[in-house]
């Protein structure tokens, strides 16, 4: 690990792939110092692949069994997984204390745990979505029954959840959501807020009658509350409710959980009317020029995948949500990743009728509107 840490970024700034160049540097070092072949091969692999785990966890949906199976195939065995996990966590935390938070800790741990399971049972027995859903249900139900709920209390709510919910939520998230929704059943909308381990992040869950403007209004409101969203899970229930889950990083003047819930509740009265707040670009970001790049591709389930790379800045997600609302585009999932001063976000989209955005003119108009908004040419 020490050697991988010393060499993993040694080739930055030399042009080309710094991971491959660093691995080549280490290979020469290992030969000249007579390191054992097996150890040298392991460290060389770690240097070459040191971004693999972080990239997979932040850019892809690790609740998807295919993603886990593919990652397990690249790692190949438990030894490589263990070393890569340690190096990845150390690399993120060592780059800047602000980059390491409770959410990234959980994200890396989830990827590690799922991959370890695949490697234990064997790559010839890949993860199966149906098995994961069943296990998640059973684990969550057992915890709820321990807390005093009966199966008859829980099942009516769970029957309204889409099957994807039991694939994308962890058992502890389902327990938390279920307890909160049932305790607030008399309310028109249920809003839950909890601190994550480490107390630098919050998880927020909103269940509310589905309608236009919810995501845009919630993102704008969270921004006004000085909460930076870095993960959003957006689902729709079978009985017409939006199920929106956000992981946010606390700001310097973040209000308490009760005030956050009250503010979000007020915003839900007319979410489509809430416009993004205006922000001055921090001086530290003015010297970074990241060209905005927007690409569209087809996604499973009659959806469109939008990949967006741009300079990170305050209010970015709120602005994106507002443009999507104006163009009558629905958001079904969002994965937000920040690498230094660059944001790399992925959104799963559809039109208002829940179909993919297939018209080239519509995609061109959406791309142009986003470019105008994100590059300061707001209409």
Show which residues each predicted segment covers:
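Divalent metal-dependent catalytic cores for phosphoryl transfer on phosphate-bearing substrates
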Residues: 1-125
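Regulatory modules associated with amino-acid/nitrogen control
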Residues: 66-379
